């Protein structure tokens, strides 16, 4: 080979080799963009605001700037934040199993029987078994049909209690009630009857003073649970600091967990005594009876936790999932209607057309109440019970929307932001139930198959109680709107302020004036 040609060829080969080597040394995986301003050690924690910060709104604003998928450094933890339905679909389909675990937080440890409450439990054989039992024995269509009388009777008694209050106050003019508190009592009654076979509130003196005291303790403890699980705890970002409990939150969590445990232990002991002296009635069994039968058959003995813990933790999961969330959604629905009076009238007119005023609304009427169904969907869109769903954790490395998500990363899905996407919804921040009848969202369902609308989540970690929730929401709202005329004092608009937490609780009471709009005998 000519010397001059060889001297030219060698540098070219060296250049190509160096270029290929550098290319091979480039990062194999690309991570989602991260907001600027991260600090050493704490990462992005300071950007998420204080304890009164509405995290889903803060993350929504970040997504407007950094895109639908972004990375956050939360102390020693890495998080992957999702803010679009396209990225969420990738999480809950292709990567659903890889992202199916839960982070081991202080709240789940201290208030959830050391991660035994299946809604907060890491992915495991125990989680699968407890979710399966809860789904089949309480939340399946067959079981819900068997327990229909509980749901219907509690709504009926709740409506009757409101009528009695109006009647006792003279029965001639509207009476003021705190609907938020009434809805909380009604939904707690319902789920406690299904789980433990007892009721707490109302019923014209049918509840003992002892049960009333326990009810207030339970209601207070549940409220504390949802508050504590939704606030920032230092040890979740820096596990090595758990011992110091710098904020005092872990002490509060332990106390709240203990308060709930006392109540649950009392329920189980009462059932033991009843079974000892009266035996069981299979068709009328509540969930504790079902769980105790499984324990007696040895079907809980092979699990990670002892039978008593398995029963208490699963009952707690059902109580938490079935009370506060339904009450909150109904509170927002009525608040939205009071601020949109023409829609309130339209909903009541629809009920009058299909039901009339000579009988009460029944489950079988709901399929004809199309506008009422749309109201519930629109409420769940604007105020999803879990605005960030439950945090997930990657069990293995995976790729989401082209971005690398390493094992151990926490997944945060901002459903609140996804369900206000202007590319999907016209006037996304406005209350427009019609969008689910003739508008852009008429084909959307809430069961997790349409990622543009998934208030109950999607995939393996979706809420197993969505069917029960929808039944409660539909019949509860229908019976209230059918039974009462409702307005605010001096027709003032309802304060729509939100409180921070795992859910979206209304910050202020919902004090309204009610009066009957159907005949008296329908309340008896």
Swiss-Prot record:
Bilayer-crossing regions: 1-21
Annotated signal peptide: none
Coarse class of the protein's main subcellular location: membrane
Statement: the UniProt record of this protein carries the keyword Ribonucleoprotein: no
Pathway: Phenylpropanoid metabolism
Cofactor(s) listed: heme
Tissue localization of expression: Expressed in both primary and lateral roots under iron-deficient conditions, except in apical root zones, and mostly in the root epidermal layer.
PANTHER family attached to this UniProt entry: CYTOCHROME P450 82C3-RELATED
Purpose: Can hydroxylate xanthotoxin (8-methoxypsoralen) to form 5-hydroxyxanthotoxin (5-hydroxy-8-methoxypsoralen) in vivo and in vitro. Involved in the early iron deficiency response, possibly through an IDE1-like mediated pathway. Involved in the pathway of sideretin biosynthesis from feruloyl CoA, a redox-active catecholic metabolite exuded by roots in response to iron deficiency in order to facilitate the uptake of iron; this pathway consists in the successive conversion from feruloyl CoA to scopoletin, from scopoletin to fraxetin and from fraxetin to sideretin.
Official protein name in the record: Xanthotoxin 5-hydroxylase CYP82C4
Source organism (scientific name): Arabidopsis thaliana
Taxonomic classification: Eukaryota, Viridiplantae, Streptophyta, Embryophyta, Tracheophyta
């Amino acid at each position: 080979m000519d010397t001059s040609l060889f001297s030219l060829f060698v540098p070219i080969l060296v250049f190509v080799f160096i270029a290929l080597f550098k290319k091979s040394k480039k990062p194999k995986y690309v991570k989602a963009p991260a907001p600027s301003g991260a600090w050493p050690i704490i990462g992005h924690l300071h950007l998420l605001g204080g304890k009164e910060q509405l995290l889903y709104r803060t993350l929504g604003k970040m997504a407007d700037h950094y895109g639908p998928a972004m990375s956050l450094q939360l102390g020693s933890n890495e998080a992957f934040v999702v803010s679009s339905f396209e990225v969420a679909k990738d999480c809950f389909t292709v990567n659903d199993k890889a992202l199916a675990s839960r982070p081991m937080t202080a709240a789940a440890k201290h208030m959830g029987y050391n991660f035994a409450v299946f809604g907060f439990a890491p992915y495991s054989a125990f989680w699968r078994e407890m979710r399966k039992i809860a789904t089949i024995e309480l939340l399946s269509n067959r079981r819900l049909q068997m327990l229909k009388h509980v749901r219907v009777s509690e709504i009926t008694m709740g409506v009757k209690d409101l009528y009695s209050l109006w009647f006792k106050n003279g029965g001639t003019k509207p009476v003021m009630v705190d609907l938020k508190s009434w809805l909380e009592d009604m939904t707690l009654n319902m789920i406690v009857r299904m789980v433990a076979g007892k009721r707490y509130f109302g019923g014209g003196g049918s509840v003992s003073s002892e049960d009333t005291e326990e009810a207030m303790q339970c209601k207070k403890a549940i409220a504390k649970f949802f508050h504590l699980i939704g606030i920032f705890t230092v040890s979740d970002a820096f596990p090595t600091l758990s011992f110091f409990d710098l904020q005092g939150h872990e002490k509060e969590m332990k106390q709240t967990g203990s308060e709930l445990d006392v109540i649950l232990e009392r329920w189980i002991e009462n059932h033991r005594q009843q079974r000892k002296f009266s035996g069981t009635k299979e068709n009328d069994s509540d969930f504790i009876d079902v769980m105790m039968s499984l324990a007696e058959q040895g079907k809980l003995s092979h699990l990670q936790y002892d039978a008593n813990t398995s029963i208490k933790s699963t009952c707690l999961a059902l109580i938490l999932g079935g009370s506060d969330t339904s009450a909150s959604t109904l509170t927002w629905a009525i608040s939205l209607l009071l601020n949109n009076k023409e829609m309130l009238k339209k909903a009541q007119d629809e009920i009058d057309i299909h039901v009339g005023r000579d009988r009460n609304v029944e489950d079988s009427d709901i399929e004809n109440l199309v506008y009422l169904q749309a109201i519930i969907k629109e409420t769940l869109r604007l105020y999803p019970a879990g605005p960030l769903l439950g945090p997930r954790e990657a069990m293995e490395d995976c790729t989401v929307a082209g971005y690398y998500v390493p094992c151990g990363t926490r997944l945060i899905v901002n459903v609140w932001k996804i369900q206000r996407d202007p590319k999907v919804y016209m006037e996304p921040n406005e209350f427009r139930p019609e969008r689910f009848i003739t508008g852009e969202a008429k084909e959307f369902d809430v069961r997790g198959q349409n990622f543009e609308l998934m208030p109950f989540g999607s995939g393996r970690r979706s809420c197993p109680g969505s069917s029960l929730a929808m039944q409660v929401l539909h019949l509860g709202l229908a019976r209230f709107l059918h039974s009462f005329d409702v307005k605010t004092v001096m027709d003032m608009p309802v304060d729509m302020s939100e409180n921070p937490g795992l859910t979206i609780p209304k910050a202020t009471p919902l004090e309204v004036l009610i009066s009957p709009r159907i005949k008296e005998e329908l309340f008896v």
